[in-house]
């Protein structure tokens, strides 16, 4: 049986060994991983010709950017509601002036959780990677001393003198994405075989 070649782009260092550990449970999988986000992830993905990998797995804005620049199918690692609840709870235990700075599809869910669970956490949204720095500065100027966000937000938060908590994806979320990548590869091959 031919192995499925997946490129895993981990947005933070701890995800890379998690991806490799999950991949061990699949006999038909050849996983290549590296840690990177946005520009360095795109440079890495572009270094490989299209179709060198069967599927690329990544998260957030990095997955969106890689998808727009590459013909290889991209599966996005999800951030579950439990992942968000975990980091929000931790943030509120550390500071009463905590805020989430992320894409609107994340901050909308945080606002829903905050309203439902009566949590006092503010959100600041951005839509493109180019907006991250200004959004973090806006958050810091508003007096928030702990910023919760993705890997690309970290450096800007630290530069503003804020504490930072990373939104991480659970093992279950990463595992589901790898499984989805395998299923997507099989589906594409089935369609190509019929043509």
Place the predicted regions along the sequence by residue.
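Non-catalytic structural scaffold of enzyme domains
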Residues: 1-195
């Amino acid at each position: 049986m031919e192995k499925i070649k997946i490129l895993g782009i981990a947005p933070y260092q701890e995800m890379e060994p998690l991806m490799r550990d999950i991949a061990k449970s699949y006999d038909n999988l050849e996983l290549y991983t590296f840690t990177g986000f946005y520009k360095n992830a795109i440079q890495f993905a572009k270094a490989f010709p299209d179709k060198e990998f069967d599927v690329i797995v990544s998260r957030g804005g990095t997955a969106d950017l890689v998808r727009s620049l590459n013909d290889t199918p991209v599966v996005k690692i999800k951030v579950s509601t439990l992942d968000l609840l975990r980091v929000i709870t931790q943030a509120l235990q550390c500071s009463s002036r905590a805020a989430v700075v992320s894409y609107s599809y994340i901050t909308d869910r945080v606002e829903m959780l905050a309203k439902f669970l009566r949590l006092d956490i503010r959100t600041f949204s951005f839509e493109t990677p180019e907006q991250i720095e200004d959004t973090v500065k806006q958050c810091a100027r508003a007096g928030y001393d702990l910023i919760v966000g993705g890997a690309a937000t970290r450096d800007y938060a630290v530069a503003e003198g804020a504490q930072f908590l990373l939104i991480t994806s659970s093992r279950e979320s990463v595992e589901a994405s790898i499984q989805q990548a395998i299923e997507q590869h099989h589906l594409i091959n089935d369609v190509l075989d019929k043509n």
